[in-house]
């Protein structure tokens, strides 16, 4: 029997798995699923919890490897960490042409953190929600932080702030304003048009960065939920296994794309005109 058969219709099952565990910051009480449209004061605490835990896991692993690193024959974990660091460092050297000690650590953090959050999509779809409901009494639980648009746009907002910081740092306030108002048409009469064009171009970077990651991971999560909700349990593996194998490529690719675009945007912001 499928999970949908145990918990109601397939529609109910799918809808349940697309609900976040939410906290109303005005009352500090959990929001019941399907109780209405989320507001500005609604916090998706499951997405926040898993993103923080996975970020802490990343820091713990890399800190442990750094403290126990040896110049002799490295272990498997040290080898994996060194390969990741070498790959990220090579990517930064190829794409970032400025001078900054922040970009490489930032790129490493972005790549590994996004990858770990994406990897949560490979867990059995009912495992953690079942534990959350029957052990902790949680009304809902989603375990893939990057399938939550608030998480991906928050990360993109951080990148956007760095874009503004490096743009102003390299060009000064006057140079930054001039870039927004005197390009692409270098004439005072075209300042309003230039401001609209450059403003849209600037704002589209974080929006596209966040929505691209969200869209791909949400779609991947939804496919797993549809397979679990519409098929009997004994036949789910026929689609789950091939999709999971293919999804590993998507998970890695999306983490790489997020890292690359972050580096490219910061490199563009660091260019002097």
From Swiss-Prot:
One Pfam family matching this protein: ATP-synt_A
Topology in the lipid bilayer: Multi-pass membrane protein
Bilayer-crossing regions: 42-62, 102-122, 148-168, 213-233, 244-264
InterPro entries according to UniProt: ATP_syn_F0_a_bact/chloroplast (IPR045082), ATP_synth_F0_asu (IPR000568), ATP_synth_F0_asu_AS (IPR023011), F0_ATP_A_sf (IPR035908)
Keywords of this entry: ATP synthesis, Cell inner membrane, Cell membrane, CF(0), Hydrogen ion transport, Ion transport, Membrane, Transmembrane, Transmembrane helix, Transport
Biological processes per GO annotation: proton motive force-driven plasma membrane ATP synthesis
GO MF term (any one): proton-transporting ATP synthase activity, rotational mechanism
One GO CC term on file: proton-transporting ATP synthase complex
Source organism superkingdom: Bacteria
Record family assignment: Belongs to the ATPase A chain family.
Alphabetical list of HAMAP family matching this protein: ATP_synth_a_bact
Subunit (UniProt): F-type ATPases have 2 components, CF(1) - the catalytic core - and CF(0) - the membrane proton channel. CF(1) has five subunits: alpha(3), beta(3), gamma(1), delta(1), epsilon(1). CF(0) has three main subunits: a(1), b(2) and c(9-12). The alpha and beta chains form an alternating ring which encloses part of the gamma chain. CF(1) is attached to CF(0) by a central stalk formed by the gamma and epsilon chains, while a peripheral stalk is formed by the delta and b chains.
Function: Key component of the proton channel; it plays a direct role in the translocation of protons across the membrane.
Protein name, entry field: ATP synthase subunit a
Organism of derivation: Serratia proteamaculans (strain 568)
GN (gene name): atpB
């Amino acid at each position: 029997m499928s999970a949908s058969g145990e918990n109601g219709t397939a529609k109910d099952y799918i809808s349940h798995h697309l609900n976040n565990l939410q906290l109303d910051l005005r009352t500090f009480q959990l929001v019941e699923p399907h109780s209405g449209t989320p507001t500005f004061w609604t916090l998706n605490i499951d997405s926040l919890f898993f993103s923080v835990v996975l970020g802490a896991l990343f820091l713990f692993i890399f800190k442990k490897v750094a403290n126990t690193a040896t110049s002799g024959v490295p272990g498997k974990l040290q080898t994996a960490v060194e390969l990741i660091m070498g790959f990220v460092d090579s990517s930064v050297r190829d794409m970032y042409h400025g001078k900054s000690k922040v970009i490489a650590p930032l790129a490493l953090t972005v790549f590994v953190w996004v990858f770990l959050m994406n990897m949560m999509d490979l867990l059995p779809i009912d495992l953690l929600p079942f534990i959350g409901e029957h052990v902790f009494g949680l009304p809902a639980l989603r375990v893939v932080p990057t399938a939550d648009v608030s998480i991906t746009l928050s990360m993109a907002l951080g990148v956007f702030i760095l874009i503004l910081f490096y743009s102003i740092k390299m060009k000064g306030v006057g140079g930054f304003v001039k870039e927004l108002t005197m390009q692409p048409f270098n004439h005072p009469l075209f300042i309003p048009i230039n401001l609209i064009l450059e403003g849209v171009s600037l704002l589209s970077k974080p929006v596209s960065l966040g929505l691209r990651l969200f869209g791909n991971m949400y779609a991947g999560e939804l496919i797993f939920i549809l397979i679990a909700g519409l098929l009997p349990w004994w036949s789910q593996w026929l689609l789950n296994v091939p999709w999971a194998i293919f999804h590993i490529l998507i998970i890695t690719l999306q983490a790489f794309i997020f890292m690359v675009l972050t580096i490219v945007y910061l490199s563009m912001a660091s260019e002097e005109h």
